[in-house]
């Protein structure tokens, strides 16, 4: 689409373009914040504060240590650490050493870990001690030469660290004996000084990150992301919040940092504006998360709908035991944000919860609802500054479509990745040349429509279309209908094999605590709101649904389980 109907609907103070973008590496934001706000907290973890001056120094020393271990510009270095100060130290240390960050999901299975180690070719990885044995088991047959190991107690306040060592370290698997060749991170930091940091001229087009996709469609692929991509998206997100106060904000860092969303919209954004990061290593521990909100009064809280919904329904929150009024702005991503979740959370906090959209191939945001302006129900919002979008026909993949027509979202912008690591065929199908010779277009695989104001709406994933008896059925539409049922807490919908229709619709439901729901009630609810061919023919009630670490329901896992059960009969 040549015009940009969304521009008139931007909030006051949000520019149409940020060009020209600064030509600096991502870690320059940390150095700038350390110069502007040296004594401001950078991370807060269980009461232990690391200031921006200290974080800059620690990451310099980490860079020196990595260089001394043989890390050269362009080398991939792994991180296998939850949301703790060590992640921030290591992340910026790798970048300052000229390395490429490869952040691994701590919940990955050994098979997934081995795949990522082999695919990325990393030779060194920094790992939290309680995950050490898992990496050692995955190490044989990979290029991984040595591990740098950190202990969670290293960044706890002294008394807490002592108690942790006495009462929990062995019990919870944090105490380990290192194999020959592996090293303690704390020893390396003590051994090196910031002055030893390698003197490198890291360029914007240098690779900063191999961001592996969440693996919702199979083994993950590594998206090659440059410093320029990450710097641009950090600034795009900053521009979207013109009321943000430099050097004063506090970010609740509950979304995983190994995920592009947490890494950019959480950490990189916060560091760029001198915000404090309140580190939450396990967001499923709602008591700990709520205690952090109560104590440290965060103003920014990037998250996912399942997390906001869990807070809304927590009995202590309902009883008014926690003060959530400090929260001003929350960008929700990774899954659809239901209106009920949004309204309840905004009533609890007095802040604004608004939905955005992004992907690992454009880390991390390309669209967002406005902070001040109208948020439209079911919409992912408008393109961020400098993001161009087209909606292309599902029939030929070429013909541009207009307002409220449904097709594949295709986009380009300064945050778009450079391709998949060692996967030229997948790169060529995802990044396609522009007929006019401009920057290539990213084919997202998401089916969308755009309204007359330039707000976009996700219809579904192209690959998850259900073809039932010749009809096209989008799972998300059915999920939204079922999620609106007052007794339904979570829902997943997918196509399963059917001898007569080819595929048929199945729904998996989690019922709210204390409620009961029957299959007949579910079908009656859908029958009033959906065409007959869209109504689920099979219903399964479950206590929980399989999800990615950022709360996205794994439809393919539900289908796999269904097929296994069917085959066993």
Please annotate each region the language model reported:
Residues 8, 134-204, 315:
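ANL superfamily adenylate-forming
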Residues 20-22, 31, 39-84, 88-92, ...:
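Conserved AMP-binding/adenylate-forming core of the ANL superfamily
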Residues 66-71, 192-205, 210-253, 275, ...:
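Conserved adenylate-forming
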Residues 108, 127, 294, 413, ...:
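AMP-binding/adenylate-forming catalytic core of the ANL superfamily
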Residues 231-250, 260-299, 310, 314-317:
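Conserved AMP-binding/adenylation subdomain of ANL enzymes
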Residues 275, 295-303, 314-375, 388, ...:
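Gly/Ser/Thr-rich phosphate-binding loop
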Residues 382-386, 397-433, 473:
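Conserved ATP/PPi-binding loop(s) of AMP-dependent carboxylate-activating enzymes
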Residues 390-410, 452-453, 515-519, 554:
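Conserved beta-loop-beta connector loops within the AMP-binding
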